[in-house]
A protein has these predicted regions:
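Active-site-proximal, substrate-binding regions of enzyme catalytic domains
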Residues: 2-107, 118, 166-185
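Acidic beta-strand-to-loop metal/phosphate-binding motif
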Residues: 109-112
């Protein structure tokens, strides 16, 4: 297992993050940051498949081998299956799959559910990153500059209608570099 900036890989990605980057045509940011270590649970893929824009993009990324699809089934560990079934009582199928996989593989979940999922991650020592954390990583790794980060954030808010806790990329930089301002993920 490799790590990027203390986030153990692979990255298990929930639909919110996929939609945020997919709708604005910025899967390239995820690819440059995480290479071929992006896992899309089948339950998440099913949620995304209803989108006429992002559904086909995900299918293409899986066919290319850029993203990997993973199904929780009888071949998985008993613990992973039990966690998944338990989590489905509290979360949707996609988020349950992401949480169960991340917990059992000891890797990172990418989600923007900063309430119940965040609490579950904290309780179970699961590494968590959200859309804003990914944008900051891309900035820090010089994949995007500050102006590009602001433009991507603006597109996510205006096109995707992403309910970001901030609309200013400077706030993102300030939080992740100085831990000042509103807590972001």
């Amino acid at each position: 297992m490799t790590r990027i900036n203390s986030y153990p890989l692979p990255l298990i990605v929930d639909s919110t993050v996929i939609f945020n980057f997919g709708i604005v045509g910025k899967f390239c940011v995820l690819e440059k940051l995480y290479g071929k270590q992006i896992i899309i649970p089948t339950d998440v893929k099913l949620e995304i498949s209803t989108s006429p824009v992002v559904g086909p993009l995900i299918d293409d990324k899986i066919k290319e081998g850029t993203f990997e699809e993973y199904t929780i089934n009888y071949e998985c560990s008993n613990r992973e299956i039990k966690d998944y079934i338990y989590l489905k009582k509290r979360f949707g199928n996609g988020e349950s799959a992401c949480l169960a996989i991340s917990k059992n593989w000891k890797c990172t979940i990418a989600t923007d559910d900063m309430t119940a999922a965040k609490k579950y991650c904290e309780k179970n020592n699961i590494s968590l990153i959200g859309t804003l954390g990914i944008l900051y990583q891309a900035y820090r790794e010089c994949i995007i500059n500050k102006n590009e980060g602001q433009a991507i954030l603006d597109d996510m808010i205006n096109i995707r209608e992403y309910k970001s806790p901030t609309n200013d990329f400077d706030d993102i930089i300030t939080w992740f570099e100085k831990h000042e301002g509103q807590e972001l993920f």
